[in-house]
Amino acid sequence: MDKKKLLYWVGGGLVLILIWLWFRNRPAAQVASNWEGPPYMTYNQPQAGSVTLPVAGYTSPSPTLPNRNRSCGCNPAVSAAMAQGADLASKLTDSITSQLNDYASSLNDYLASQAGV
């Protein structure tokens, strides 16, 4: 085996090792296909009107009962957390807006005093 062939084998092996190291530490949700749906649908607790499959963390909708929790794309805990987050975001936005308005008015006053208006 000449040097060129040996170099190709070593380089290919290093590439395979790098690929293995890259995927070894990644969470399964990033590697696996997204067949369970978005992440907020993959909670481990079974939801009302669903059949628990032997796949960890996946519940399929029952063919007979309507699954009201899954039809909106989220469970009640996630809905409550999203509402709380939206409330906090609106409060934060209001606070930042008022602070920026105060800063802008004080800056206008300062600039007007400097200009002698």
From Swiss-Prot:
GO cellular component terms attached to this protein's record: membrane; viral inner membrane; virion membrane
Disulfide pairings: none
Spans through the membrane: 7-24
Principal location class: virion
Membrane topology recorded in Swiss-Prot or TrEMBL: Single-pass membrane protein
Cell compartments where the protein resides: Virion membrane
Function: Protein of the infection vertex complex, which increases the vertex stability. Anchors the vertex structure to the viral membrane. Essential for viral infectivity.
Protein's UniProt name: Protein P16
Source species: Enterobacteria phage PRD1
Gene that specifies this protein: XVI
